[in-house]
Amino acid sequence: MNRLKEKFQKEITPALMSKFNYKSVMEVPKIEKIVINTGVGDAVSNSKALDNAVEELTQIAGQKPVVTRAKKSIAGFRLREGMPIGAKVTLRGQQMYEFFDKLVSVSLPRVRDFRGVSKKSFDGRGNYTLGVKEQLIFPEIDYDKVSKVRGMDIVIVTTAKTDEEARELLTQFGMPFQK
């Protein structure tokens, strides 16, 4: 069993039950899934860029991403409906906990001038979104093989009903929020 999942069952669940006065263990919020999305703007003119992004996301997440396609045509961006413009991967279960552990303990501390993640990035429904400016913070990415520095969005979907519950859940998991 994963280190974080064990911590969730043994420490976090009882702590959240006492703090929010839950009557049942099933009421305790948990992390449902983590979605990693990267937009590849230059995929329109350069199809190799998308292949590189897919390769990097595969290394970071440990599973093959889905290529996302344009919903609408936008002439200003020289974009046709159905053109590939990005990649996303959804992690659940074991891989989700492993990725979250790696994100909190290894990757985020490698960000330059890191003072913690914003407390304001909750969506009002208990989900947390985090933007990463460069993929180099992940240990799997080899600096010499990177063709272009790409950012990504990491969305942590929880079963929490409010932002306060979700913030407490992520804090217990070790998410470094700003003071």
Curated annotation (Swiss-Prot):
Pfam families: Ribosomal_L5 (PF00281), Ribosomal_L5_C (PF00673). PROSITE patterns: RIBOSOMAL_L5. One of its GO terms (molecular function) is structural constituent of ribosome. InterPro entries: Ribosomal_uL5 (IPR002132), Ribosomal_uL5_bac-type (IPR020930), Ribosomal_uL5_C (IPR031309), Ribosomal_uL5_CS (IPR020929), Ribosomal_uL5_dom_sf (IPR022803), Ribosomal_uL5_N (IPR031310). Gene3D superfamilies: 3.30.1440.10. SUPFAM superfamilies: RL5-like. GO terms for cellular component: ribonucleoprotein complex; ribosome. Keywords: Ribonucleoprotein, Ribosomal protein, RNA-binding, rRNA-binding, tRNA-binding. One of its GO terms (biological process) is translation. This is one of the proteins that bind and probably mediate the attachment of the 5S RNA into the large ribosomal subunit, where it forms part of the central protuberance. In the 70S ribosome it contacts protein S13 of the 30S subunit (bridge B1b), connecting the 2 subunits; this bridge is implicated in subunit movement. Contacts the P site tRNA; the 5S rRNA and some of its associated proteins might help stabilize positioning of ribosome-bound tRNAs. Part of the 50S ribosomal subunit; part of the 5S rRNA/L5/L18/L25 subcomplex. Contacts the 5S rRNA and the P site tRNA. Forms a bridge to the 30S subunit in the 70S ribosome. Belongs to the universal ribosomal protein uL5 family. This is Large ribosomal subunit protein uL5. The lineage of its organism: Bacteria, Bacillati, Bacillota, Bacilli, Bacillales.
